[in-house]
């Protein structure tokens, strides 16, 4: 393993390189060649996994990626994962991980969705040419009282509201 960048870290593993300033490389054949890179390489291949632009978070994990926020993979847990070979996150939604199930009034949900302001917008931190569409979190929270914060919309809540509105 090679450690060359100022304030860079290679905590262990094998065949790792952290040459960017403030970079991190761990696992196997991880190369953090640009400033601010974090790279984790699994042991699935001898080929390196590289960070090719500054300030990126790069992980090679052909066995999948699991982010658990409670429990463990063998029992009731909360979290998200990307299955091996998959392209998208899957949120835990197992009935056995839930409690206090309550029925909803799909027609009421539909009425609220129809009244929910929807706009196109861009993030202040993005190029203005990149557009998105959706409700503002504060409006969504006021209408449905779902999730952890009135400043965010969980995709699992947005999906549930959309499916309920379709049923309505």
Where on the chain are the PLM-derived regions?
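C-terminal intramolecular chaperone/autoprocessing and neck/assembly modules of extracellular spikes
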Residues: 55-56, 61-159, 163
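Periodic small-residue-enriched repeat registers in elongated scaffold domains
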Residues: 1-77, 81
